[in-house]
Amino acid sequence: MSPDIQSNNRISIQVSLSGYSFKVLAPDGAVVSASASWLGPGTVFTTPELQRRYVGAEIALMTPKFALVPSAFLLPGEEREALADVCDLAPGDEVRVCDVPQFGARLVYSLSVGETLSKVIAQSLSAAEVLPEIWYLLRALADVPEYNRIVASHADGRLYLAIAQGKTLLLANSYPAPDFTTAEYYLFLAVKRLQINPEASAVWFRTPLGPAEERSLYR
């Protein structure tokens, strides 16, 4: 049995309307294998990494339908109203909620974005739970060693962004960004408005970046 088939590995998958990306992780967090770029939906049944079994699977869906609310302010039964205040909801959109204890908040969200790929992948991975990408961005902030922490993703013309200083969350939002240049604009605009020193900050992207995008980001 090869190392990347062992049951103690985990897989992390990001899904959008246009496709998906993945990383296979060893128990120590080291990347065993990963997609070099965004993959089309038609490759789901032929990608070897998606045909294997893992000790754990994480599936993140790119959905702009979310609201982060302080736990004390979100009363039972008010989840849909809280989400409708910040995004457009169709009558049939399912609204869910999960805890974000590290920031004393609850994340209200909807996975109803007109795709079925996340469900197909989840079923192939023993019904793994699908959570919004912003939930994983918020969790990833703790992995950034610098005091100024910035974690982002860019897919399907949208930037997802979370920023914190130490243990204090400053921003969790998404922005329309049809290209990476626009994504950078919103990223650096947020940094400027929050009065964060970009030279003393770390920017982590969860979505794959091409060489040109990496050069542009860190120039």
Predicted features by range, described:
Residues 10, 105-106, 149, 201-203:
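Short active-site oxyanion
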Residues 20-142:
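Active-site neighborhood for divalent-cation/phosphate handling
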Residues 12-14, 53-67, 198-209:
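Short glycine-rich phosphate-binding loop at a beta-alpha junction
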Residues 28, 65, 167, 209-211:
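Residues that cap or initiate secondary-structure elements
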Residues 1-31, 141-169:
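Gly/Thr-rich phosphate-binding beta-strand-loop-beta motif of the actin/hexokinase/Hsp70
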